[in-house]
Amino acid sequence: MINIRAARLEDISKISSVIAASWKTAYRGIVNDDYLNSLRSDHWVDFLDSGLGNNSVFSMVIENNQEVIGTAILKETENKCEVCLISLYLLPNKIGQGFGHIFYTGVETELKNKGFSNCILDVLENNKRAIRFYKAHGFIDTDIEIKAVLGECNYTCTILEKTL
């Protein structure tokens, strides 16, 4: 049974594990292997604990048979009607089975229910699979690029946006 819900503080460890596992698969060949190999399952625990604890970010999870298989992390922007999708990840063995579509659709519904009218995100420009996924869900390219530093390497990210 699929369930999409708001993340709870007790989910933080599992969420961090999902993100780490997903990064190691999704970004292999895109991000430096040394950086990916250095990621531990608890890499995001402090960020999540702080962000969820002080409400600077909010998170949702997707469960399959009561197992957390994916997570989305979001942050309200300065424009109170706009939200930034910081991340949307699934466990690697759940990718390509329709869970991503189900999860994104549920997240979008929740964002609309919260009163958001626009969503932005950044995606590594070489992450073609993610770009296809987001464009299939109505995101458009803004032609804005930002730089990201992961480990000691620089990467270019493309900003996508969607009217909800």
For the regions a language model picked out, list residue spans one by one.
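Extreme N-terminal starter segment of soluble prokaryotic enzymes
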Residues: 1-3
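Acetyl-CoA-dependent GNAT
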Residues: 6-12, 16-94, 101-106, 110, ...
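Short polybasic/polar patches that bind polyanions
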Residues: 95, 112, 135
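Short coil/turn segments at alpha/beta junctions that flank glycine-rich nucleotide-binding fingerprints
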Residues: 97, 114-117
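C-terminal "cap" of GNAT-fold acetyltransferases
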Residues: 117-131, 136-137, 144-164
